[in-house]
Amino acid sequence: MAKLSKENLLLLFTVLGVVVGIGLGFSLRDPSKAWSKRHLSYLRFPGDLFVQMLKMLILPMIMSSIITSLASLDSGTAGRLGMVSMIYYTLTTFFAVFLGIVLVSVIKPGKWTTTNIEDLVGHVKTTPCVATAVDTIIDLMKSCFPENLIEATFRSQKICLKFFNGTTEIPPEIAMTMSPEQRAQFTEVPEKIVSDGMNILGLVVFSVALGIVIGVIGEDGKPMKNFFKSLEACSMKLIGWVIIYSPVGITFLIAAQIVGMKDPGQELHRLMGYVITVILGLLIHAFVVIPLLCVVLARRNPIKFVGGMAQALLTALATSSSSATLPLSIKCCEENNKVDPRVTRFVLPLGATINMDGTALYEAVAAIYISQCYGNDLSLGEVVLVSLTATLASIGAAGIPQAGIVTMIMVLIAIGLPTNLFILIFPVDFMLDRLRTTVNVHGDSIATAVIERLCEDQLQKGGHHLDTNDQGYSMLSTNASPDPKRITIGNNCENSHML
């Protein structure tokens, strides 16, 4: 009862933090005088600390949890988990894209705007990287196998295209405004760009391989398995401490974002049709499609399940980062919704990297909306191209704030539009980014229940459940109880097993 009260109290403070952050943000806004970046950084400082503490724990948590989970399974069970996860994630992403295309084609929000596109394009601050869909696929495959594992913990690579007129390089800001036909007149040279940021996909692939190998070699792998079990327990305990600070961090993150907006009302009015379309799509996917999958495939009560994920969803809303929310997602799935830790610690890190339903839906809507604003009606083939490219772009999107605006450039290239037209939607991206991140985290969490149900037989045959006291399952709570609990998967009381 004391544990339940403490968890409810933390959730209450998290909700209160959201409300206080909104109120504080609007009360500190001064329409006549904008805040300087320095002053905004001061206001955002407590929130930045919260996000950085979460990100600090991502690396040890991801590697230790995946390795420990898969080391407890036989190779057949691990393979089944991976195959089912990939199929499920791909299908839900495709459906999200399809839903977005249907809504934007019916509502036609691009016809609502009176925006002067030429004025916007002329004042855009461009992104100095142009890449095609093929380049992105190649980047994705290469990211799975980093040549230097240590470098992958803090640096990632991608391919950017540079254009030359003879020996003279075309400035990236000019290349971005050109159509594919115009770019074809110049020499195209792909170049590898190294950027700061963890290569999570590469670390996940390595951890999966290492975990399977540790399980295969048996007794010889026990020292490694015990090491990662201890590392996981420590990571989870640290996460539990960081989460206590979450209401404070969330308050100042939201307040700083609101204070930094130039004119929320004017920007929202200009993009009203687009915002309505995206939000409607996200609501349908989050409250109809995903809960339906939860009922039909997982045989769980979606309302109760979402209630157990409330704290993670609020954190996703505040941080707009599925990667930063990952530690809390694992905690909520395991402690509140009683999902098998072997599933959560494999499925959630993978989902935070490649399962971006909300991002995929947003990219499909945004690309067609921009095309409508530009006066370009897409053909059926171009719509199909948008769906495929949006799916690939969402898979390649990093779980960081506003990663979707970067992958949007790839979708615009695919349909032949100037890439700097993303400025049309940029003013409201901060808000939609938080909503689509919340949908991403929501979809990942439901995926754990679905995959647990679909792989139930293999999980029962593939090895014992994780020892929650050794591995930190209970360590997420500051006053965890060592007593095991018997739970059931779905509504099947005959298939109960120990956690």
UniProtKB/Swiss-Prot annotation:
<feature type="binding site">
    <location>
        <position position="440"/>
    </location>
    <ligand>
        <name>Na(+) 1</name>
    </ligand>
</feature>
<keyword id="KW-1133">Transmembrane helix</keyword>
<comment type="similarity">
    <text>Belongs to the dicarboxylate/amino acid:cation symporter (DAACS) (TC 2.A.23) family.</text>
</comment>
<keyword id="KW-0479">Metal-binding</keyword>
<feature type="binding site">
    <location>
        <begin position="320"/>
        <end position="322"/>
    </location>
    <ligand>
        <name>L-aspartate</name>
    </ligand>
</feature>
<keyword id="KW-0769">Symport</keyword>
<keyword id="KW-0029">Amino-acid transport</keyword>
<feature type="binding site">
    <location>
        <position position="444"/>
    </location>
    <ligand>
        <name>Na(+) 1</name>
    </ligand>
</feature>
<dbReference type="GO" id="GO:0015813">
    <property type="term" value="P:L-glutamate transmembrane transport"/>
</dbReference>
<dbReference type="GO" id="GO:0005886">
    <property type="term" value="C:plasma membrane"/>
</dbReference>
<keyword id="KW-1003">Cell membrane</keyword>
<feature type="binding site">
    <location>
        <begin position="400"/>
        <end position="404"/>
    </location>
    <ligand>
        <name>L-aspartate</name>
    </ligand>
</feature>
<keyword id="KW-0472">Membrane</keyword>
<feature type="binding site">
    <location>
        <position position="433"/>
    </location>
    <ligand>
        <name>L-aspartate</name>
    </ligand>
</feature>
<feature type="binding site">
    <location>
        <position position="355"/>
    </location>
    <ligand>
        <name>Na(+) 1</name>
    </ligand>
</feature>
<dbReference type="GO" id="GO:0015175">
    <property type="term" value="F:neutral L-amino acid transmembrane transporter activity"/>
</dbReference>
<dbReference type="InterPro" id="IPR001991">
    <property type="entry name" value="Na-dicarboxylate_symporter"/>
</dbReference>
<feature type="transmembrane region" description="Helical; Name=4">
    <location>
        <begin position="194"/>
        <end position="217"/>
    </location>
</feature>
<feature type="binding site">
    <location>
        <position position="351"/>
    </location>
    <ligand>
        <name>Na(+) 1</name>
    </ligand>
</feature>
<feature type="binding site">
    <location>
        <position position="440"/>
    </location>
    <ligand>
        <name>L-aspartate</name>
    </ligand>
</feature>
<dbReference type="Pfam" id="PF00375">
    <property type="entry name" value="SDF"/>
</dbReference>
<feature type="transmembrane region" description="Helical">
    <location>
        <begin position="87"/>
        <end position="107"/>
    </location>
</feature>
<feature type="transmembrane region" description="Helical">
    <location>
        <begin position="50"/>
        <end position="70"/>
    </location>
</feature>
<comment type="function">
    <text>Sodium-dependent, high-affinity amino acid transporter that mediates the uptake of L-glutamate and also L-aspartate and D-aspartate. Functions as a symporter that transports one amino acid molecule together with two or three Na(+) ions and one proton, in parallel with the counter-transport of one K(+) ion. Mediates Cl(-) flux that is not coupled to amino acid transport; this avoids the accumulation of negative charges due to aspartate and Na(+) symport.</text>
</comment>
<dbReference type="GO" id="GO:0015501">
    <property type="term" value="F:glutamate:sodium symporter activity"/>
</dbReference>
<keyword id="KW-0813">Transport</keyword>
<dbReference type="InterPro" id="IPR050746">
    <property type="entry name" value="DAACS"/>
</dbReference>
<feature type="transmembrane region" description="Helical; Name=5">
    <location>
        <begin position="227"/>
        <end position="254"/>
    </location>
</feature>
<keyword id="KW-0915">Sodium</keyword>
<keyword id="KW-0325">Glycoprotein</keyword>
<feature type="transmembrane region" description="Helical; Name=6">
    <location>
        <begin position="276"/>
        <end position="297"/>
    </location>
</feature>
<dbReference type="GO" id="GO:0046872">
    <property type="term" value="F:metal ion binding"/>
</dbReference>
<feature type="transmembrane region" description="Helical; Name=8">
    <location>
        <begin position="430"/>
        <end position="451"/>
    </location>
</feature>
<feature type="intramembrane region" description="Discontinuously helical">
    <location>
        <begin position="383"/>
        <end position="416"/>
    </location>
</feature>
<dbReference type="InterPro" id="IPR036458">
    <property type="entry name" value="Na:dicarbo_symporter_sf"/>
</dbReference>
<protein>
    <recommendedName>
        <fullName>Putative sodium-dependent excitatory amino acid transporter glt-4</fullName>
    </recommendedName>
</protein>
<keyword id="KW-0630">Potassium</keyword>
<feature type="topological domain" description="Cytoplasmic">
    <location>
        <begin position="1"/>
        <end position="7"/>
    </location>
</feature>
<feature type="binding site">
    <location>
        <position position="359"/>
    </location>
    <ligand>
        <name>L-aspartate</name>
    </ligand>
</feature>
<feature type="intramembrane region" description="Discontinuously helical">
    <location>
        <begin position="303"/>
        <end position="333"/>
    </location>
</feature>
<dbReference type="InterPro" id="IPR018107">
    <property type="entry name" value="Na-dicarboxylate_symporter_CS"/>
</dbReference>
<keyword id="KW-0812">Transmembrane</keyword>
